[in-house]
């Protein structure tokens, strides 16, 4: 069964991007090179979902080749209410509306591989509201922004969340939480 996972980095005060939708703060923090989590986790991902702002940031900062560099040949579903530039020869669908039909399409296509919710937080919240979010994986950094795009702009209580793992890696703490559907 396809597992829906929100994997992102956030600041100590719970933001995934600053008030200009920038991730520059993230690259100032040393990455724990000794961490093998990504190498173990990423092969389980069959496809990606992201919002328009995340997609635009990726294009602006990495160019069209960044999709293949970061995600390989994995298909993507980009939620948007505006026209966005496609990336040639990359399997991307621009979608809008309810997350359930997109999840069903992705799950059927991925054949049991996991679906990575790249962001943003409100889109992830919509997956949660639809009962589709299975896991949250956060790399928390020792940075505060004071404002910006929140990690998950929803009230989700401990009745629905359970800590599974926490690990200090360099200057980051990785937290894995299970989400009850």
Question: What are these regions, as identified by a protein language model?
Answer:
Residues 1-181:
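Enzymes that bind and transform nitrogen-containing heteroaromatic metabolites
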